[in-house]
């Protein structure tokens, strides 16, 4: 059975970088998918689906539920390793509930943990505006993305806390201790 870890955090929390470094360090055992990268790859392809996705991403809004779930399920099925890390998901209560439903209807993938990379809004804003990754990294879009992230957050955290799947990593440190702590946490969870 494949073991899935979801990494959540505010825009600029470092969740994608953290997950990517963990997977790169253990590529034979861990596959990393970023929801954002999966969606941006569709946009870059120029497909009709990509154009639909772009109309949401460019404004900092959520992509429709069915598109996101289908994108993720395809990625999970294609994963070449036992351990899979997906960052940036879920971003809404609806995504969480639909994904939980999809996972409960199959026996190939087990959600082992939801790791929150926690940072303050101030740190997140400084990081996002400093990285200049694309058109979706400006102040107006940042505040919209923060709102989109924080509005459902308590309900998402409550849901996973009740399932004893929620874990927190302090994301305000330098990258090395964050990645080391996350690696250690994943190993600990896998051994339970």
Swiss-Prot record:
It is found in: Cytoplasm. AMP binds at residues 35, 40, 61-63, 88-91, 95, 133, 145. Residues 34-63 are annotated as: NMP. Residues 130-136 are annotated as: LID. Pfam families: ADK (PF00406). Pathway: Purine metabolism; AMP biosynthesis via salvage pathway; AMP from ADP: step 1/1. Keywords: ATP-binding, Cytoplasm, Kinase, Nucleotide biosynthesis, Nucleotide-binding, Transferase. GO terms for biological process: AMP salvage. It is an enzyme of class 2 (transferase). GO terms for cellular component: cytoplasm. ATP binds at residues 12-17, 131, 173. Its EC number is 2.7.4.3. It catalyses: AMP + ATP = 2 ADP. GO terms for molecular function: adenylate kinase activity; ATP binding. Monomer. Belongs to the adenylate kinase family. Consists of three domains, a large central CORE domain and two small peripheral domains, NMPbind and LID, which undergo movements during catalysis. The LID domain closes over the site of phosphoryl transfer upon ATP binding. Assembling and dissambling the active center during each catalytic cycle provides an effective means to prevent ATP hydrolysis. Catalyzes the reversible transfer of the terminal phosphate group between ATP and AMP. Plays an important role in cellular energy homeostasis and in adenine nucleotide metabolism. This is Adenylate kinase. It comes from Campylobacter jejuni subsp. doylei (strain ATCC BAA-1458 / RM4099 / 269.97). The lineage of its organism: Bacteria, Pseudomonadati, Campylobacterota, Epsilonproteobacteria, Campylobacterales.
């Amino acid at each position: 059975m494949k073991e899935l870890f979801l990494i959540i955090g505010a825009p600029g929390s470092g969740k994608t970088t953290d997950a990517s470094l963990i997977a790169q360090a253990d590529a034979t055992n861990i596959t990393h998918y970023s929801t954002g990268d999966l969606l941006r790859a569709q946009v870059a392809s120029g497909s009709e689906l990509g154009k639909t996705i772009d109309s949401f991403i460019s404004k900092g809004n959520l992509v429709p539920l069915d598109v996101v779930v289908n994108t993720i399920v395809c990625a999970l099925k294609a994963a070449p390793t036992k351990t899979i890390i997906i960052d940036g998901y879920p971003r809404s209560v609806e995504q969480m509930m639909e994904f939980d439903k999809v996972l409960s209807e199959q026996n190939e993938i087990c959600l082992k943990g939801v790791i929150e990379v926690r940072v303050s809004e101030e740190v997140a804003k400084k990081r996002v505006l400093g990285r200049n990754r694309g058109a979706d990294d400006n102040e107006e879009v940042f505040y919209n993305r923060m709102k989109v992230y924080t509005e459902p957050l308590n309900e998402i955290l409550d849901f996973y806390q009740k399932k004893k799947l929620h874990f927190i990593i302090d994301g305000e440190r330098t990258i090395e201790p964050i990645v080391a702590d996350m690696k250690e946490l994943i190993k600990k969870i896998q051994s339970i």
